[in-house]
Amino acid sequence: XSNATDETXLKDVSA
């Protein structure tokens, strides 16, 4: 990822 969400724990934006 790239977004903060992905950094925290791989959310929807995990591709």
Curated annotation (Swiss-Prot):
GO molecular function, one term: NADH dehydrogenase (ubiquinone) activity
Membrane topology qualifier: Peripheral membrane protein
Gene Ontology CC, one term: mitochondrial inner membrane
Subcellular location: Mitochondrion inner membrane
Organism encoding this protein: Solanum tuberosum (Potato)
Enzyme Commission number(s) of this protein: 7.1.1.2
Keyword set, alphabetical order: Membrane, Mitochondrion, Mitochondrion inner membrane, NAD, Oxidoreductase, Translocase, Ubiquinone
Protein name per Swiss-Prot or TrEMBL: NADH-ubiquinone oxidoreductase 20 kDa subunit
Subunit structure: Complex I is composed of about 45 different subunits.
Keyword check for Translocase: yes
Function (record text): Transfer of electrons from NADH to the respiratory chain. The immediate electron acceptor for the enzyme is believed to be ubiquinone.
Catalytic activity field: a ubiquinone + NADH + 5 H(+)(in) = a ubiquinol + NAD(+) + 4 H(+)(out)
Superkingdom of origin organism: Eukaryota
Keyword Lipid metabolism: no
Lineage of the species this protein comes from: Eukaryota, Viridiplantae, Streptophyta, Embryophyta, Tracheophyta
